[in-house]
Amino acid sequence: WATDQDTLVRYLLSLREVPPGRPRIIAIDGRGGSGKTTLAALLQRVIPKTGVLHTDDLAWNEPLFQWDHVLIDALEQLHATGALTLTPPAWRAHGREGHIVIPPGTTTVLVEGTGAGMRAATPLLDAHLWVQTADDVAQERGLRRDIAEGVNGDAVESVRFWHHWMAAERAFFAEDRPWERADVILCGVTLPGLGAGEVAWNGPSTP
């Protein structure tokens, strides 16, 4: 389906009734470089009072895909209090200052990042999007971004990191298979003929 973004938003907000005082929690999952951050920015613009929780922050200095305990802590705090102030244990251990904060009054929280929709988090999510992008496209995007930002060193170091990352990512996805639990599967590339403000996704489920 190709629909305007408002149709997608209405569908996401209709999937589960959320109790008063708690934000709706929507996971945006997919390969590294698939377009998750771009989608999160789009949804944050069109859904009022939306905060974004990046798994890159939760997983900082944790072993790859072994940070489910940090994600669960964050989601349980959002369920219990409607807000979040969290210093992940690896931040303290490695001297990173500050906190991850979702302020009171936030009505929607987008959990954005590879692994956001992992099986362990499913009971705490209200909606789950999977951004589908081919491996080669995701790798090219991710490498271009990381080299430009210098987050994993120079070009040689970035390529080395991505080979390590994608091996761990494939192993995690082979076991967890998050797309099978997704409420929405969305195309992470711009398709020919897609109009401004349109998104390509699998469309609302029908009985």
Regions found by a protein language model. Name each.
Residues R31:
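P-loop (Walker A) phosphate-binding loop of NTP-binding proteins
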Residues K36:
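Conserved lysine of the Walker
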